[in-house]
């Protein structure tokens, strides 16, 4: 007999779902959008249908009991009337209709569903949500939601009802992000896209009536396309947090967690949002730290941590070397490093002399080389390369932060690639700060194309180092 656990909404739930096959949900070849409107062109279901039809390599069918035509395509009166079975059903109807539709999906041999609709446990409809979960579990039918945005897999599927022109989406990459909140997921996806961090998968699980974080963690741990697994978590059912931490500890990939509900006010907000039990945050946070699971304190940390760990998986001690053309930026970086438990070893006179000997004549007499290394605004590509070579060889350092201000007149757009190759040759992790403006794009891409994460802020760069230090050994 399987154990049960009791969430804050008072419903009994099995502590573990069976081993779901998520392939049809995340890489469907055929999709049905149930609940399209023949009256409102911008109805959420219509947006989803049209976007999938125009942008993704799947066959998509529109379903509405009234039939008709939508965007020049036939509208079918029911899931059972489609010309062939579908892998994924996207359900966007009023809550009271979802149970019957779910039954029809099961009878029609649909592979799984994402239930976009709200109006369940988050507004007190506990009974209806439990009926959905019981029916699906009885038939081995996986669904995401309800009360969610659903699934985004670059190049495969996008069930978000947000038009493509209103939201920047990440390109394909190594990071998977699972979020209880659709809004948080959208916000983070935009930030990831802006920083050039690619996604393998984004999932909004909403009320997580059936498929939960633990199920997706197990799937993503085995997914060859995913290198880093991140979660935004509002709460767990009783006992579920313990199981999640144990699974995350055993996961062979970096796991990053951003948890809300840290305060009593936050716990109330969580309960009204997705009907989750926030639990004791201090206990959960301590468990993450004990087992080497990276915790992000805020959204900036989540993005920074994912960016760093998608490039560097092995943990470090946190001994940082800093190279920059501006003493002020170096001082700011040192302060931030100190606040986050990172050390900045100082170079002795002998070490400084060796570095100085390799600098250009215009920089030799004015550079400060104690760590941070301040090459001044007169530095050339060669000066940065020489300094990076010395730091990359140093056994006293295990990571380098480059703070680049591209207005320095003597540096070129090739510097990012050249510095990346120096550090790669010595197997030394490199993190870069470059302001994210279009005129610096070639410089930034020189880093990114060579597997070096780039932050648009000094704090973000330091947080990337913090993530590598806090990661559990692979």
Each model region followed by its residue ranges:
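Catalytic-core regions of core metabolic enzymes
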Residues: 3-474
């Amino acid at each position: 007999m399987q154990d049960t656990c009791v969430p804050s909404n008072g419903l009994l739930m099995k502590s573990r779902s069976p081993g779901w096959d998520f392939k049809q949900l995340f890489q469907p070849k055929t999709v049905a959008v149930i609940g399209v409107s023949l009256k409102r062109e911008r109805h959420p279901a219509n947006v989803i249908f049209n976007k999938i039809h125009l942008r993704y390599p799947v066959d998509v069918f529109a379903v509405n009991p009234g039939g008709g035509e939508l965007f020049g395509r036939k509208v079918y009166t029911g899931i059972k009337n489609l010309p062939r079975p579908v892998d994924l059903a996207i359900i966007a109807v009023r809550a009271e209709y979802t149970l019957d539709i779910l039954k029809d999906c099961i009878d029609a041999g649909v592979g799984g569903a994402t239930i976009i609709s709200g109006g369940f446990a988050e507004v007190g409809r506990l009974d209806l949500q439990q009926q959905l979960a019981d029916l699906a579990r009885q038939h081995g039918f996986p669904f995401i939601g309800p009360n969610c945005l659903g699934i985004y897999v670059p190049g495969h599927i996008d069930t978000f009802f947000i038009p493509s022109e209103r939201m920047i989406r990440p390109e394909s990459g190594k990071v998977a992000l699972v979020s209880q909140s659709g809004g948080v997921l959208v916000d983070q996806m935009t930030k990831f896209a802006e920083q050039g961090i690619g996604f393998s998968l984004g999932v909004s699980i909403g009320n997580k009536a059936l498929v939960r974080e633990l199920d997706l963690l197990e799937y993503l741990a085995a997914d060859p396309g995913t290198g880093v697994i991140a979660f935004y978590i509002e709460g767990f059912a009783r006992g579920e947090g313990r199981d999640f931490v144990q699974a995350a500890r055993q996961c062979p990939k970096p796991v990053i967690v951003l948890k809300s509900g840290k305060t009593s006010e936050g716990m109330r907000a969580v309960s009204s949002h997705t009907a989750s039990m926030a639990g004791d945050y201090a206990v959960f946070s301590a468990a993450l730290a004990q087992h080497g699971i990276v915790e992000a304190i805020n959204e900036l940390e989540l993005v920074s941590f994912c960016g760093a760990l998608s490039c560097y998986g092995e943990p470090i001690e946190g001994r940082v070397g800093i190279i920059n053309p501006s003493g002020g930026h170096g001082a700011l970086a040192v302060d931030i490093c100190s606040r986050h438990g990172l050390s900045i070893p100082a170079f002795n006179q002998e070490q400084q002399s060796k570095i100085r000997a390799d600098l250009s004549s215009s920089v030799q007499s004015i550079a400060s080389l104690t760590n941070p290394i301040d090459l001044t605004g007169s530095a050339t590509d060669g000066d940065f390369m020489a300094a990076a070579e010395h730091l990359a060889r140093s056994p006293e350092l295990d990571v380098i932060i480059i703070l680049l201000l591209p207005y320095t007149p003597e540096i070129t757009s090739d510097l990012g690639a050249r510095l990346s190759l120096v550090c790669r040759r010595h197997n030394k992790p490199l993190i870069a700060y470059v302001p994210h403006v279009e005129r610096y794009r070639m410089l930034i891409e020189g880093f990114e194309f060579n597997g070096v994460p780039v932050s648009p802020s000094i704090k973000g760069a330091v947080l990337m180092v913090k993530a590598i230090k806090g990661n559990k050994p692979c």
